[in-house]
Amino acid sequence: MSKKLHIKTWGCQMNEYDSSKMADLLGEYQGYTLTEDASEADILLLNTCSIREKAQEKVFHQLGRWKTLKDKNPNLIIGVGGCVASQEGKAIKDRAQCVDIIFGPQTLHRLPDMIEQVRRGDKAVIDISFPEIEKFDRLPEPRAEGPTAFVSIMEGCSKYCSFCVVPYTRGEEVSRPLDDIILEIAQLAEQGVREVNLLGQNVNAYRGATHDGSICSFAELLRFVAAIDGIDRIRFTTSHPIEFTQDIIDVYEDTPELVSFLHLPVQSGSDRILTAMKRGHMAIEYKSIIRRLRKAREGIQISSDFIIGFPGETKEDFADTMKLIEEIGFDHSFSFIYSARPGTPAADLPDNVDMEEKKQRLAILQDRITQQAMRYSRHMMGTVQRILVEGPSVKNPMELRGRTENNRVVNFEGLPKHIGTFVDVEIVDVYTNSLRGKFIRGEDEMDLRRSLRPSDILAKHKQDDDLGVTQFKP
């Protein structure tokens, strides 16, 4: 009888990536298979997030539900990982005796050893340390699950924004070596992955060591990834404006594999609030980045993060945010009401914005961005869009679902053979969260894979001089 593993994941794409690695790790080394049913699992893992309000209470409510399962099955192992685990540590065990393992984002690779310790009789295993980036050396080879894949390129953040817990829960910025990243992506490409999403708390701070001891920048990494055979689209999440340098913008000008969509958090349009947040830039600097980006890549779509009701935010500050939203024309946003995170500098500031006022501001902001997104979507009506087909449609499994370069979901009628490939569709209808497409052509009609060897090019432009030396003139 196979051993079962159930993982519940909250939070960002980095957590989703970490959870997939936990499943791969325990599957390869200990033979566990994933199950959606917690009641039939031998191990329950909760991968937590501490960004939002009441994150800790959410964890303990879930553990309370799992405790009833452990009461019925004393051999059940329960583990808590992620940022809440890193932040709370032993306090989780003190409050929830049913927990056997507590591990941080940087120690998930030690899970097999921790499980063995519990099996041998240890009452609780806690490891929330920050080893350099050792975990990537201990994880099994990547396994593709469809045509898209997340690839972590770095961990942590060293910006210390006043509202953010990430530097305290995931540590400071540490970059993976270039060769490790390229190998992982090449392995995924061999398995049919066509699009990679490079992950990190601040990817444009990437500074990875190379085989010769030099340092690879994020812009250079993007070009290396674009050169990998089979990788046709590159996305990345997430960035910080103060390190969105000109060399990164230049990649948008000459690297078509990099999609015409960028998520660049700004948090506020008020210089006063940006200063209080310790973001390290002003609104005009953010606008300068976007202006240069749109010069390098016409039509690029921009999304962002916004925090509403940060301590001291006035009506004038919020008006500055709305002005920035209109000037930039954001296509999408992740926007939240501010909630103090314990241990951050902003937690000591007086939260003097009325909750009803916060809710009203959030509704106004979200409504404006929804309007802007719908306007962009309507402009796509009648156009032909190239989409990567990810699988069956969520609402209608008889149809297919794909995603445009600018990150819009398109549902259309197509054949199963198109899954994992690119197709061209005409946009025939627009909805709030998706588009409707009509199939135009498949990848076999696009000539995407044509490649010319250098000798072929030379043969077409062969010019011998008097000495018989071949010269090439493009």
UniProtKB/Swiss-Prot annotation:
Cellular component, GO annotation: cytosol
E.C. number(s) listed in UniProt: 2.8.4.3
Residue ranges occupied by any MTTase N-terminal domain in the UniProt entry: 3-120
Binding site for [4Fe-4S] cluster 2: 157, 161, 164
Predominant location category: cytoplasm
Cofactor note: Binds 2 [4Fe-4S] clusters. One cluster is coordinated with 3 cysteines and an exchangeable S-adenosyl-L-methionine.
Domain Radical SAM core: 143-375
Keywords for the protein's UniProt record, in alphabetical order: 4Fe-4S, Cytoplasm, Iron, Iron-sulfur, Metal-binding, S-adenosyl-L-methionine, Transferase, tRNA processing
Catalytic reaction list: N(6)-dimethylallyladenosine(37) in tRNA + (sulfur carrier)-SH + AH2 + 2 S-adenosyl-L-methionine = 2-methylsulfanyl-N(6)-dimethylallyladenosine(37) in tRNA + (sulfur carrier)-H + 5'-deoxyadenosine + L-methionine + A + S-adenosyl-L-homocysteine + 2 H(+)
Binding site for [4Fe-4S] cluster 1: 12, 49, 83
EC category: transferase
Cysteine pairings via disulfide bonds: none
Keyword match Metal-binding: yes
Subcellular location: Cytoplasm
Cytoplasm recorded as keyword: yes
Domain TRAM: start-end pairs: 378-441
UniProt GO molecular function: 4 iron, 4 sulfur cluster binding; metal ion binding; N6-isopentenyladenosine methylthiotransferase activity
Cofactors demanded by this protein: [4Fe-4S] cluster
Signal peptide (residue range): none
Family named by the database record: Belongs to the methylthiotransferase family. MiaB subfamily.
Subunit structure: Monomer.
Known role: Catalyzes the methylthiolation of N6-(dimethylallyl)adenosine (i(6)A), leading to the formation of 2-methylthio-N6-(dimethylallyl)adenosine (ms(2)i(6)A) at position 37 in tRNAs that read codons beginning with uridine.
PANTHER family, alphabetized: CDK5 REGULATORY SUBUNIT-ASSOCIATED PROTEIN 1, MITOCHONDRIAL TRNA METHYLTHIOTRANSFERASE CDK5RAP1
The name this protein goes by in its record: tRNA-2-methylthio-N(6)-dimethylallyladenosine synthase
